[in-house]
Every structure is written in C-alpha cells, then in structure tokens.
A protein has these predicted regions:
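Zn-dependent metallo-beta-lactamase
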Residues: 1-56, 61-65, 69-72, 170-171
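Active-site metal-binding loops of divalent metal-dependent hydrolases
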Residues: 9, 59-62, 103, 135-136, ...
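Metal-dependent phosphodiesterase/nuclease catalytic metal-binding core
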Residues: 47, 179-181, 191-213
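Residue-level marker for buried hydrophobic side chains located in beta-strands
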Residues: 55-57, 99, 130, 202-204
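Metallo-beta-lactamase
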Residues: 76-90, 94-106, 121-182
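Metal-dependent catalytic neighborhoods of phosphoester/phosphodiester hydrolases
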Residues: 109-119
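Conserved small/polar residues in nucleotide/adenosyl-binding loops
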Residues: 214-220
Length: 224
C-alpha cells in the first residue's frame, strides 16, 4: 500500500469561527490572523494506492461555485486537486473510489466540475464510485439550520444523480478493505479511514482535527 498527500486548495476562514471558545491570544500563536481576522487553511486529501484500487479521500472545495462564494473564502496559492493528483504520478481517470469523510462543501466540492460550456456538471474522476454512509447522507440532504449552509445541493445532487453513490455502514465489511472510524463530530457520522502503514496505524482525521497543532488538545477539539 502506498500513500500520497494531496492538496486540493488553500483558503481563508475567520479564526474565531474555527477555534470557538479558545482565546485568540492562544490560537494566533500557531495560526496568525490577518487584519480581517482570517486565518490560512489548506484542504488536505489523501490518495491510497492498493493492489487493485486507487482511493481518494475527500476532494476539497472544487471550482464550480459562484464568484461571490469564492470571494467569501478567498482562495490563495496555486494548488488544486487535479494538479496534485497528477503530481503524485496519477491521472484522474485512475481513481477508482472517492471516500468522503463527510459532505461539507470543502470536502466533497471537488467531485464534479463544469463542462466546457458551463451547462452541466461532469465528474472530475469519471471512473470512480463515491462512498459515504447512509446516516450521514440523510443528515446532509435533510440538514439542520446550523449546518445547512455547509451542505450544497450543487455538490450532493450530481453525486446522487451519477448513479455511483455507495454507502458503507459501521460494523459491516466494505469493498474498500479499509478500517473506518465513525465519529459524531464535527458533524453526524463523519467517516475516517484508518490505514496500517510501515508498522503504524494512521488515521485521516478529516475535520475532527481540522487544524494541526492547534486542535490537538482536548479543549480545542471541535464538537464530538
């Protein structure tokens, strides 16, 4: 098994929204804010290469939303999902499966993009199945007011309409042959892959620990 870190893009969010009750005097030591209190963030994904599958974990924000949307999140840097996959030595057509830790826009937005004349969405990974779990899918498609803005129909509908949406359920075998950790934070039934690699157990933390270093201590971890 081989692992390849993927960067799907970089953007900004309000530091107070990211760290909640943690005082700014603490979090700004590791995540300095700009004049608008925005901190730099990175959409990190993972490619898992096994003997018969190439699994992409999460897809970042994507590029199909409106200019107003992207003005809010202020993308920066030159990184993007497809270039990062190619940089790892693969082509988007090589990806067999896309495992979505959860369905917030910054984790599943890169599954689809516009076609050439911007009249329809097309898959970025045309040979891939999309994996979620039924509990989280229901949570995303019937969202509560708190999370509604994070679950975008332009992301979810194309996945469902593709006919390639698959569900993995807790405690049941799955075709991906991955151990999965199901957590109710920071959204319902987030699904985190665990991989045995070089004698270690690695866990892709998704948004359970969205910011390295700063979100590692118990008081700073997002709601579980």
């Amino acid at each position: 098994m081989n692992l390849f870190p993927i960067v799907a893009g970089r953007f900004k969010l309000d530091g107070g929204a990211m760290f909640g009750v943690v005082p700014k005097s603490i979090w700004q030591r590791t995540n300095p804010a700009d004049e608008n209190n925005l901190i730099d963030l990175c959409a990190r994904c993972l490619l898992i290469e096994s003997s018969d599958r190439l699994i992409l974990v999460d897809t970042g924000m994507g590029d199909k939303q409106s200019e107003r949307f992207f003005n809010y999140y202020k993308p920066w840097g030159g990184d993007n999902l497809v270039d990062s996959v190619i940089g790892a030595g693969f082509h988007p057509n090589d990806v067999t499966d896309v495992l979505l830790t959860h369905l917030h826009f910054d984790h599943c937005g890169g599954c689809f993009t516009w076609n050439a004349d911007r009249t329809a969405f097309v898959p970025v990974f045309p040979n891939a199945d999309y994996w979620s779990n039924e509990s989280h899918w229901q949570w995303a498609t019937q969202p509560n007011p708190r999370e509604k803005a994070s679950f975008l129909k332009d992301n979810l509908n194309p996945i469902q309409e593709s006919g390639r949406l698959r569900f993995i359920e807790k405690g049941k075998d799955n075709p991906l042959d991955l151990d999965l950790l199901f957590v109710d934070g920071h959204t319902e039934k987030q699904m985190l892959p665990m991989v045995d690699w070089k004698g270690e157990k690695l866990v892709f933390m998704g948004d359970l620990i969205p910011v390295s270093y700063t979100h590692l201590t118990l008081p700073t971890i997002l709601r579980v």
